[in-house]
């Protein structure tokens, strides 16, 4: 089995990480080591790359690919979620780093591997776990959550207009027999979404699948704390690069970045700051960096990618 994944905004990430040959860099979502390979190539003898991934197959693949690169730099790959970035680095004797990269997209490998159940384009058991050792699966969400909870997830995490109908149709369908596969779920969603709404736009199941995946992996719940931990871990002048793929993630990253840049909680009417909270960082790019037309031609999945960069002060 091969780990297939095209790295998004690769050149931009390398540029904005502003790599120091002797620095320490963390790729919190190493995947197939697409971004990490280019970081690693730019490190000298005293440099170090740390990779994290909760997918054990990604860990195995990234180690093999990094081993193939001729470099005097050191690298370490840890099988863990990026929410554990501080403890993972501490376990390696690392207390501060020069740069951190987080690519929040599901890898092409995970989407294309039908058995993982991420894709509405392949029939597979409902799974969607990025960490296959996790207990909660998409099957559990679809078959065990209440109609109200399913509605809330699809509405909030999928921003789906037809969330109420989809939740109702799911709970009605499972009364007859469990919803076991991705195609079972797709069929239910297609019945729930009016035909007029299915004619235009993305696949009718796209937003619901996104929402369930976010719930299964607690993707948004861990993001706020992770950003705080990343900034704490950075040296002064170190940079945090985060790539998002949907508006919910991007909104969280933007808000957390703004808190780091302007943490003051004083009322606007106050002439001077009285809360004493000092900025921890500056924005490198006020607007998100997006893929150019050349990258979009090669990799359509990059269309929704946004890169935001923060520098610790």
Swiss-Prot record:
Annotated InterPro entries: RsmH, SAM-dep_MeTrfase_MraW_recog, SAM-dependent_MTases_sf
Record's GO cellular component terms: cytoplasm
The record's annotation in Pfam families points to:
Methyltransf_5 (PF01795)
| Catalytic reaction equation(s) | cytidine(1402) in 16S rRNA + S-adenosyl-L-methionine = N(4)-methylcytidine(1402) in 16S rRNA + S-adenosyl-L-homocysteine + H(+)
Q: Does Transferase appear among the keywords?
A: yes
Q: What is a GO molecular function of this protein? A: rRNA (cytosine-N4-)-methyltransferase activity
Q: Is Magnesium included in the keywords of this UniProt record?
A: no
Q: What is its main location?
A: cytoplasm
Output one GO BP term.
Answer: rRNA base methylation
- Tell me where it resides: Cytoplasm
Chain sites annotated for binding S-adenosyl-L-methionine: 33-35, 53, 82, 103, 110
Q: Which UniProt keywords apply?
A: Cytoplasm, Methyltransferase, rRNA processing, S-adenosyl-L-methionine, Transferase
Q: Its Enzyme Commission number?
A: 2.1.1.199
Family to which the UniProt record says this protein belongs: Belongs to the methyltransferase superfamily. RsmH family.
Function per UniProt: Specifically methylates the N4 position of cytidine in position 1402 (C1402) of 16S rRNA.
Protein name per UniProt: Ribosomal RNA small subunit methyltransferase H
Species of provenance: Ruminiclostridium cellulolyticum (strain ATCC 35319 / DSM 5812 / JCM 6584 / H10) (Clostridium cellulolyticum)
Q: Which gene encodes it?
A: rsmH
